[in-house]
Structure formats: structure tokens, C-alpha cells
Amino acid sequence: MAVTLPESVLAQYERFSLYNSPYPAHDGGCAIDLYPGTLADGRTTAAPSPVAGTVRETRTVRAPPKPYAPEHDHLILIDPAASGPLAGLTVRVLHVEPSVAAGDRVERGESLGRLVRAGFFAPWVDNHLHVGVRDPDQNPYRASGSLPLELGVSVRPLEWDGTGRVVSTGDTYAVLDSPAHPDPGAAFVGVRADDGGVLDGGLPHYDGGGLLERPAPVDTAGAPAERVVSLNGDRLGVADGRTIAWDDATVTANGEPITGLSLFCARDADFGAKLICPERSFERGELVRVRVRSSDER
């Protein structure tokens, strides 16, 4: 059973991704990362609840050991309100140090606590809430096992020719001015694949990604059919339904390899291609050409 996240849930956040993660909890688009708006320093701490409901439990959980982050995170379980769109299900939220406790009633958009960065985060990942939805009889503590998620909003595919100028940088990433959001705040957008649909995921530094906003073709038996996915003529991988298995490929910026591209859906004015590049640095204003080279071309 798939669960649809309505516009009232998603509209609270500036960005989201179903597939941009290395963790099995996101396999098949069974979890979503929700990114609130950022503060002046590029980070955010507020953690707006995706739903109204009652907090069932909060607990501290282990996180992968990383030299730059704590080895613990926090899990919040919420029973959605009976009048809400996710009534009868269990909502699980990670990456929030809770200011709420079991039995507390929360409204949609009310802060659950303070967003935190644990060992689940790669250094280039912005603060966000990790959200999954389960049937009430499912184990709420296991990392994997949440229900597949569908989007109750449309995401506009933006064509991108692979070029842009650097507008911001960090220690491990650079952001380009293209593709630019044509109407910030009004709708979610994402990078368009050559044959339609919106690309979602870490290419190729995570194992796979997603192709949103395009109905999956079916074979003669009515089952989802596989199809090749490309960007600017560069083959990225093969989609089975909406899930893409990336090829053995390398992303290059001005002809030199980088870790990859971060692909997501956004409605903020700062949307643009995000290069993951801890091994390289770029200057603001620098013109960059991005390509994807398959193993056969290397």
C-alpha cells in the first residue's frame, strides 16, 4: 500500500527528496527527507511537524560513527489526528532533538524540537527531517519497512543543459545558478530527464535514484517496464518503475571528475544544480559544464 503525502504536508518545507540518501530506509521511495527554510548562516534549527497528532514516544537511537557528528540521533513517533490525511497510521521522524514528550498534542507545522546532525549525515547534506509512514501493526523502530510514498503535489520538470555559474560554495559542495526556479515559492521544481520526469537522488554517489512525475510504462502483462534514463544525452541508468539503478558512471565538472550531483525537488529561489565535490574547489562566478561519463567512455 502506498501513502500519499498531501500538499498540506509538503508545502511547509522548501525542499524534499524521496531518493537522495544512501540508506535502505529510502529504497523504493519509502521515506522522504523534508528540508525547512534556512537561516542566514545556511542552516536551520526549527523542525515543523509534518502532521497534527499525538506524540506516542521519543527515544535516542544509535547513528553511524562519523568523526564530525555524534553517534546518536533521535526518533519521534506520532499518531496522526483522526481528522487528518494520515489517520490510523504511524509517522516516524528522525534527526530532531525533541522538545515534545509522549502524550503531547502537536499541530501540523508546530516545532517538534531542534534539528540535529548525526552520523547519518554526509557533510554536504543540509539539516532536514527524515519521515516515514507505517501501518500501526508494523515495527516502528526498525530503520526499514515504511510504506511507499506518493506525492500529493506536482513537481515541474526544468530543462538544464548542464551548465551554470557558481553562486555559493561550501567545504564539500558548490551550487550553480542554473536551472533557475521560474516562480519561487509557487511550486516545486526539479531537474528534467531527457524523456521527461524529475530526477531525484545522489548521482552516482548513492546507489540509485528516482524518476518522479512520469507514469511508469508497463509491459504486456501490466507490470512496470524498465527504461533507460539520460540527461543531455548522457546515460544515467535504468528505471524500474520510478526507481533508477545508476550506471557505473562518473560526473565531471569542466572535464574533471567530482563525487556527484545532488538531485532533489525545491520551491525556493536558491534552487540550482548542486555539485558534490569535497575533492575540488570552485570560485564564485566560475562557469561550469557538467557531464556524466559512463564506464565505457572512461
Regions found by a protein language model. Give the residues of each.
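Short, well-structured beta-strand-loop connectors
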Residues: 46-57, 100-115, 285
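Extended, charged low-complexity segments
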Residues: 238-298
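Zn2+-dependent peptidoglycan hydrolase active-site motif and core
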Residues: 55-97
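Short glycine/threonine/proline-enriched tight-turn/helix- or strand-capping micro-motif at secondary-structure
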Residues: 12-49, 66, 148-153, 186
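Generic structural motif
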Residues: 49-57, 109, 216, 220, ...
